[in-house]
């Protein structure tokens, strides 16, 4: 092999160039991905030894190539040799042979393929060795810093196992820390040493952080030297930064002392002798404490407030009284060229000012409740820094103000809309004026500042001010009207739009959008400038800028139309014209094309008048006609033309209007049934409008062609029934009658189709069109044809409704009489009896002047029919008829109480009635009491269809009457009777599928009590509760937040086999083990699977992983759900899978090794295949997401096994899904 030849060439050559070329070629060959994949180091046993020797080659160039080779093959080093390889590299670093040993070691440790294996011995071998090496080196040597960097980088990867660190190794860590902080003044080394100690303290054993507390307590003491304070602050800073990155890491030892540390830092900040660099660090730590630890800000506010004011204004080189609120605006106006006062390159006081402002920002971002206090106390100080002589201070002051104004609406929403006694007790404001008045004042000062900006103001500051002004205009609570002119003047600071950076262009467009949204009268004065900017932005090559500019232009159109609907300025017209020109060109971005179509069509609709520019309108129609033929824009163009023709009803006023109209109509007809469903809908909607507008201009032959086209479309297309029928109803009756028989046959065939599902609108349209083209004598034949439909009773209801509407339209009592004879005849077929019963339930007896009560009794008598379909039809018809009269409600209740008929059938009647009717509280209350009476005595209630029907009826009653009946549901759930609890849960579950906005608060309240029932010893109650929880996760996710932790722990406790529910049953000579809780456990796993969709679950993935691995040892269905959970976990967090990769792969191996035999039953065979396919899905998902050699090795075994074909199929499925 070529690798062996190259290694031999290196070993045997004394020429450094040949050795270099040999290793260079070897590195190039190894770097080939396909070659590396199949490389096995066992074929070249001396490879590693040779490469490790090459790291100390006499030639530096050869050493570097050796480092490359070691880094590339590190993922191929066998596990049994990996530890010795790392130890050899550590020996090379310790022996000071070459710095390339360290480079090679660093690259190996950072290789994700070897990390799972190194993780096993990092804490016991690698980390202590590093510490010993650091003790040997002099801190002044450059190698010391290089090794320290590698140690810190590796800790970031391998800190998860530091909990096993031995005490003597921690002492080494302390020695290194002390060596760095006492023998060295180099800032970077001290910072790395602090990171080293903080990481070990956060992730190491308990004794580790005791030392760090001692260091902090000693360093932050009142009489400590500044050098020790400096070290302690840097150490505390690193700990807080680590806790910010790793939210799950243990920082309890900081949290317990947070108040003490905060007070100590405030005391240190008061010391005037503290240098600016230390003050900067103290402020950084203070900001982190306030933002990420629960500091009680109210307790320290008087001290903190005064300190921040002094530090924000801290400038020893300038004496100025700018803290007076009355003088702040004058100060900003006078100091418009503040930076030119003096230049002092050694002055770093600006860092203190900047860090002080960052502390304010930390409070605003993390502690919303304190926003009014912060603005009132510190707002003027922050605003005063808008003209600071240091650019970075100006920028951070702008950011503070921007974030404060962004949070004002949120504060008002959360705190100013409720009467919060607790806030008043704590001394926190809850009145809207507490924040509004201060904000309005600050906005007025900012407005004056913006209006006085100098030409010398840096572009970066003007750009950020632009963003600040955008935020101000976007808010409705900051009083922008009084400062409109001053604030909006910032637009004129950018005279040449074409030369601006793309980010500033975007921000300008967003500012214009915000200005338009505020709706001030003064906008008219800026119309010219804003039109010019938007026009230039639309023409830009950057799609996002063009798109946002177009959306803003559309808002501008609506604003102009609202203010001056008949008077459009020249600049505004030019802006629209340039957008139309862009639409004519071949612009590639689809989003921009769609926005352009929407803009030009809305412009026509908004400003169309009899004297509207007909040439412009003609151009718009021609362009849209072209877009109608381009596939990506067909639907949008069709809808735009719809809207335009609904406004422009007289096409003769358009130049060549009739010709353009005919072209659009022909194009519409050409594509109406050849495109996808979305486009068909759009074309049909356009055809409807075109027929309304220009029917009188169309030849009879063309109308006949359109009719034929619509009939053919109706035959094939069951998705667009409504749109097709609307078009048919516009065609003149004389044309329709020519194809009467064909049309009726098509409609009947359409109705008899098993795939057709009609809504209320389509039923009305069908009734109308049949009535338009038919005569009364045709009616009986048409209705009889409906009975031939092979549909279940529930679907025949729709056909019966059409028949009933036709009877009412023609006022045909004769048909009713004929149907009644068929109904009463004992010789009538069942299907005729079913259909007639359903018709009687839907007739409008008032219109027909027929006695409805007679038909009520006739229908009710069929509830005892020997045929099940007739009984069901009678139940549905009775419910429909009940919705016509309050008298029938009482009669239906009486029938239910009488026990003369099957209660399940009568529940179907109630269900039908409640879906159609709105009833008052008294009636709802009465029905509830009747339906829910004596349910505790019903046997097999949990599995009975009766429970489902009853739950739906009661659920509809609750949603019908909103909250009034919720107390009865709560009474049921608090009952000790199992049937009561089951009913309350199933009613609640059904109500979750309905949209009842008024019930949201009651739903949350009920759920927080009811969800605990999944711990109920009654397994049926527990299972129904789990079904409820799954439904809540899907439909009312917000209800989960407050109960998440308790729910998760409860589910985990129920996920394992409960021995108290397992018993042995003797069946003949055999004994069978029965697990009564298996259904409950299945639902627990389903609930956990659904719960993974809640964002909070990302903080508890370890629990899900443990449960899913345990579930792989359970019964078949639970194994399947566990595999689905695992697949989700791989998507959520591949790193957590890496931690348990061996356990997971072992569980997958057991499943994939399952085999079918000749004696295996088909059911068992299918179950095995389902399991194996699910396991293979998890494996391939792991391969995609986790970069781990163990997974690759396992995959190669699967590809050689009996399920290799299934695995390839699953790979293709997943890849196709990802592409889609």
Curated annotation (Swiss-Prot):
BP-aspect Gene Ontology terms: protein neddylation; protein ubiquitination; SCF complex assembly
InterPro entries in UniProt: ARM-like, ARM-type_fold, CAND1/CAND2, TATA-bd_TIP120
Disulfide-linked positions: none
Keyword field: Nucleus, Repeat, Ubl conjugation pathway
Predominant localisation class: nucleus
Function: Key assembly factor of SCF (SKP1-CUL1-F-box protein) E3 ubiquitin ligase complexes that promotes the exchange of the substrate-recognition F-box subunit in SCF complexes, thereby playing a key role in the cellular repertoire of SCF complexes. Acts as a F-box protein exchange factor.
Keyword Nucleus among UniProt keywords: yes
HEAT repeat locations: 1-35, 42-79, 121-157, 259-295, 365-410, 615-650, 680-700, 701-737, 738-775, 810-847, 850-887, 1020-1057
UniProt family annotation: Belongs to the CAND family.
GO cellular component: cullin-RING ubiquitin ligase complex; nucleus
Subcellular location field: Nucleus
Record has Nucleus as a keyword: yes
Protein name per Swiss-Prot or TrEMBL: Cullin-associated NEDD8-dissociated protein 1
Domain of life: Eukaryota
